[in-house]
Amino acid sequence: DRFFQAAGIMLLEGYGLTETGPVLSVRKQQHPVIGTVGPLLEDIEHRVVDQNGVLLPPGKKGTLYVKSPQIMEGYYKRPDLTEQVLNDGWLNTGDIAVFTVNGEFRILGRSKETIVLLGGENIEPVPIEDKLNASEAILQSMVVGQDQKFLAALIVPDMNKLEEYAIKMGINYVQNEELLSNPEIEEYVHDEIQSLVNTRNGFKHFECIYRFTLLSSQFEVGRELTHTMKIRREKVSQLYHREILKLFI
C-alpha cells in the first residue's frame, strides 16, 4: 500500500468471495483508507463474532458473517457443505476481520480450517494431514496454501526414523539441522508424502502436496496446539511465516 502511495498510484482494494456474488466491499475513491478493504457495499449486513458466537464491537477482531440478497442460496447438490456455512441467511466467510469506527474493515486471516486456493478450490486440510501423519517418518504436519496456486506442508519429522534412515544410507551429519537439509533425507520424506497423498488414495490432484519444509521442533500444547491437540493454524502461520513464504517463491 505505502509503496504504491509513494509512487502516486491509487489502489482501490476490495474484498469478496465466490459465495457472495462476489464483491462485498471496496475502498472509496474519494477517501481510500490504507490497510483496509473499504466499507461494505449497501444492503450488506455484517457481524463480527468471537469463537463463542458473541457479537464484537468495532476494533475487536473476530469471524466475519455477512447477509445480503446477493449471497448464494447454497452449494450445488451439497446441502452438507451449505449447512456448514449458511444459517438463516448469514454466511460464515471463514475470515477474521476487524472494523473501524468509521466502517472500514481489514481482513486479518482465516478462522476456518478450509483452505481456498487461488483457483477457487476449497480444501479441507485435516484429512490430508491425517494421511501424512500416518507415515512412520512424520509426527505432525500442517497443510498450507491459502490464496496460492498449490498446497504445501510444514512437516515435523520423526527424528528417530530419519536417523535410522541416515545410518542405513550412510549419511553423515553432526547436528539435526544438517540431517533435515540433506537432499537424500528430503527425497525420503518427499517419497513418503507422494505415496500417501495422491489420486490413487482418493485425493484430488489439487489436494496433493507439491512442496514441504522440515521443522526441527515439535508442535506443543499451548503454543502450536490447543489443549485438545488441534492445530492453532493462525499461530503456526505466524511462528513459521518465513518458512511458509519460501514454499511459494
Where are these regions (language model features)?
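Active-site glycine-centered loops adjacent to acidic/histidine catalytic or metal-binding residues
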Residues: 16, 38, 95
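Gly/Ser/Thr-rich phosphate-binding loop
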Residues: 1-32
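Conserved C-terminal "lid"/linker of ANL adenylate-forming enzymes
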Residues: 115, 140-142, 190-249
